[in-house]
């Protein structure tokens, strides 16, 4: 009986692996992919044109400036993946945990923390009819509550592949070091993140500041930016557990070289790109929530430049190498404030 159960488990694992292998083979580039994709025929939203069909129509229209921008981003991503990605392990369902599903509108959204993901979760909840369709009425706590939005990892391999074929998949990215600076400021340098600081800040202080005061070792409330970077670069960090999602690389969260993304939005052009996605979803009347106060790209860049100013060129280079794939895949140049060796 024991051997028979073991064989069944091995067979089930093999079937799951084979199904996910199909998932990994999904084409990255939009235009070649249309010939092999259902274009909404298996979409769960009904007879109206799916967001993927609308994007296909725009892709054929030379007058659509935004469609051209997103086509270029897809092509650049596809080219960078071909040049720089290595053979990787098979994707497991848990790898799809960051891909959220909106069956009613035919959307797959891979969220990257510190790239407007709270507001995108608000929007998806509003699209589902919660808070009477007003994303601004949804608190950040509600938006991040577990189970409020289904993840692609919650479905069977067959259901995963069906959605990958028929739905519009999108993600939003940000200049990697500006995202890192934002994560440090909001999670380790602000007083309202006490629980996060006790978990990660205390660990950083205990490892990197041997003579720290007991209060700092317990609370982790005064982590310096240089200590945070040293923690990221320490090989022990990733041996102990995966990076926290707030500083994990975007490509490691969303696997853009193995999953096909139709729209690559950018934090730097957030308003335009968000409106483009909402238009494809048939929700142009829904306003994407803006930040509580005006923050331009210059403010984000200035914060990163100020924090990196006192970091040595040696550590700047090591950190750039750690996040290099995000720079390459999403077409970001090395920041001008870096002094790379």
From Swiss-Prot:
Its main location: Golgi. A motif (Cell attachment site) lies at residues 132-134. GO terms for cellular component: Golgi membrane; membrane. It is a single-pass type II membrane protein. Residues 1-9 are cytoplasmic. It is found in: Golgi apparatus membrane. The modification Phosphoserine is found at residue 139. Glycans are attached at residue 331. InterPro entries: Carb_sulfotrans_8-10 (IPR018011), Sulfotransferase (IPR005331). Highly expressed in adult liver. Expressed at lower level in kidney, lymph nodes and fetal kidney. Residues 31-341 are lumenal. It catalyses: chondroitin beta-D-glucuronate + n 3'-phosphoadenylyl sulfate = chondroitin 4'-sulfate + n adenosine 3',5'-bisphosphate + n H(+). Keywords: Carbohydrate metabolism, Glycoprotein, Golgi apparatus, Membrane, Phosphoprotein, Signal-anchor, Transferase, Transmembrane, Transmembrane helix. It comes from the Eukaryota. 3'-phosphoadenylyl sulfate binds at residues 113-119, 174-182. GO terms for molecular function: chondroitin 4-sulfotransferase activity; dermatan 4-sulfotransferase activity; sulfotransferase activity. Belongs to the sulfotransferase 2 family. This is Carbohydrate sulfotransferase 13. The gene is CHST13.
